[in-house]
Regions:
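A non-catalytic, amphipathic alpha-helix used as a structural packing/dimerization or gating element
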Residues: 35-46, 95, 161-172
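Acidic/polar active-site rim loop that often engages polyanionic ligands
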Residues: 25, 80, 143-152
Length: 191
């Protein structure tokens, strides 16, 4: 997997895009408005500057990270070559179902569809698609570039191949993945 799409440039989305881009992935960051995208890129830039100030990143690495991110206001323009799409929109079930239906229609057949939901059933979200075996939860903790934990949530139909790919991807990002079944609140929000 090389080409990542992140839907939503807010707090979680820009952190997810930052993390993938800093790890060397090409990221298409999508939001409904250019203003939201500009705010997201500004936040990523500020966070990268903080990492530089601590001596943990160079200006060249910052430029590479920002160069790995392309912004889009139309989902249809961003998904053509996606290997993984991570949805990080507002925690609203109807909105997520609508987005997943669009993702399913626009993404290549082999693309994995992930959600950053903290509480909505992965099985329910997968029902909006024709590829429930490729739908999975990938719940990052805030602030994403710093927090190591990521919950990998299997829906009823999520395949072992999809789970294994996202579990390993999380390790590549420097995260500590934990396997979670599709229960209300998953792990972090149940505690």
């Amino acid at each position: 997997m090389k080409n990542i799409v992140v839907i939503g440039a807010g707090t979680m989305g820009n952190g997810i895009a930052h993390t993938f881009a800093q790890t060397g992935f090409k990221v298409n960051l999508v939001d409904v408005s250019q203003e939201a995208l500009d705010r997201g890129i500004k936040t990523i830039t500020t966070n990268l500057d903080r990492i530089i100030a601590k001596g943990n990143l160079t200006e060249e690495q910052k430029a590479e990270t920002l160069g790995n991110i392309t912004t889009f206001t139309a989902l249809s323009d961003a998904c053509g070559n996606a290997d993984l799409i991570v949805e990080a929109a507002t925690e609203n079930q109807d909105l997520k179902l609508k987005i997943f239906k669009q993702m399913d229609e626009l993404a290549p057949e082999n693309c994995i569809l992930a959600t950053n939901t903290s509480s909505i059933s992965i099985t329910k979200i997968a029902s909006a698609t024709k590829r429930p075996e490729k739908v999975i939860g990938m719940h990052f903790m805030n602030p994403v570039p710093i927090m190591k934990l990521v919950e990998i949530i299997k829906g009823y139909s999520t395949s072992k191949e999809t789970f294994d790919a996202i579990f390993e991807m999380s390790k590549t990002l420097g995260k500590v993945p934990v396997e979670v079944n599709d229960y209300p609140g998953f792990v972090a929000n149940r505690i």
